[in-house]
């Protein structure tokens, strides 16, 4: 809590930050040795903000989105190991070169509310102003963690933990065709989103041809938050089990419930979302 001096006003005014400590608190990890991606990403608070927001950190991980994704969306993604909290994205720059499977160490500033691309990246933990980078080795890999669409649903209690991570959902059916992404459900009946912002041309063409009721054996990609929603970013056809794709002619699509969501986290956002289940 802080108070001003009361000069030129009726009295001393005070302010408290964070205003709601059930939503967010101040603090960060202290430890011997290097900070990990998990340290940067993990939070106990529902805001999802990194405890290192605004701090310069150095982390190491294996590239899961390389030059091909940088060419499409201007970012890279790295992950230290399989599982939640272990992935993060960072801004690229002209001349940067990182290949899928490179183990890299990068230094940058943790940013939750991108000052340049607010609506695109706000509430997605990422590294900006990357000052130093080193390729330690090549030819590495990270296994995706298999999750359910419930885990990746917009209102899931664990959805934040998969941000920046390589994930796989299996035996899913296309439930909705949105202007910029697709909703899929597994046996749970709960929808998560898949997207083509990071996809190569072949994968983008495939996704563009999806129909309501299309069933897919598995979808893999990097889970991220952008343009106000969580989604799986498909990279290439290696992320799709295409041999198991078929149309379920008996699939019946209808919303069971709908909710009008507030324009969180930005109340001035002119877009209002109706979410159907």
Q: How should these model regions be labeled?
A:
Residues 1:
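Extracellular, beta-strand-rich glycan-interacting domains
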Residues 248-264, 268-277:
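Glycine-centered coil/turn sites that cap beta-strands in beta-rich domains
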Residues 4-245:
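OB-fold nucleic-acid-binding modules
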